[in-house]
């Protein structure tokens, strides 16, 4: 292969340097690797569909396992158990990403793995679950109102979030940039009469063998912050309307980009 001399790129730069090969010039190959992986083949699309189905089924099983007085950590265990029964895999320390602060706290936090609380009826639980099936990742979930449904202001926030997600997904076409999609989502909140449109988190990433699948830097060295969609990318859309445990609303949809 001619890899014993010349300029050789490694997606793990540290590994390349540890080889200590004096006859090669070690360069960073992470971005070229991500460039190749960002657009999915038909086979990869099917693998990602299967992984997504495992996540959806595991979420439904977990919800069905809930009972009054159940603790958050026990609920997490039900999700992990369901994933294994369905043939999937969850990395330690767990699949759930978002924290669910209680006591009226509107903070946006990640699950610390030490959080624990009684999952009371009427609480909004944010499902953002990570795992793999046949090495391909799943990512996604929505808001579950424990033993009920959204009411009052929370229902308005939920409806606005659903409408924003629908509008953004419709706009997720080849050539569209992330900043354009964020503007589409915020515009829906403003026209729906919901306050705090600028506080809503709207973000995206690639999905495949990892939860990145994107170049961090373009070929000219410019950070790839406002990246452009391409056909057959698989891109999760995330929208989080912040609030306390009765008002925060979350939706994540995994989207295949098509013309």
Language-model regions: role of each:
Residues 1-259:
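Active-site neighborhoods and metal-handling regions in enzymes and metal-associated proteins
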């Amino acid at each position: 292969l001619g890899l014993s001399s010349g300029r050789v790129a490694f997606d793990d730069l540290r590994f390349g340097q540890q080889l200590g090969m004096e006859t090669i010039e070690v360069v960073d190959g992470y971005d070229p690797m991500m460039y190749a992986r960002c657009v999915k083949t038909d086979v990869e699309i099917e693998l990602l569909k299967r992984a997504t189905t495992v996540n959806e089924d595991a979420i439904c099983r977990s919800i069905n396992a809930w009972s009054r007085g159940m603790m958050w950590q026990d609920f997490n265990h039900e999700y992990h158990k369901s994933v294994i029964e369905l043939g999937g895999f969850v990395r330690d320390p767990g699949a759930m990403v978002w924290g669910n602060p209680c006591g009226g706290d509107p903070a946006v936090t990640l699950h610390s793995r030490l959080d624990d609380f009684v999952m009371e009826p009427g609480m909004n639980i944010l499902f953002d679950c990570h795992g793999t099936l046949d090495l391909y990742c799943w990512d996604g979930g929505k808001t579950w109102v424990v033993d009920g449904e959204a009411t009052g202001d929370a229902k308005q926030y939920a409806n606005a979030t659903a409408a924003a997600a629908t509008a953004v997904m419709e706009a997720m076409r080849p050539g569209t940039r992330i900043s354009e999609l964020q503007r589409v989502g915020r515009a829906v909140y403003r026209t729906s009469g919901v306050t705090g449109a600028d506080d809503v988190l709207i973000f995206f990433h690639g999905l495949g063998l990892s939860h990145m699948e994107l170049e961090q830097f373009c070929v000219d060295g410019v950070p790839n912050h406002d990246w452009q969609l391409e056909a057959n990318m698989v891109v999760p859309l995330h929208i989080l309307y912040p609030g306390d445990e009765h008002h925060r609303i979350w939706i994540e949809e995994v989207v295949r980009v098509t013309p």
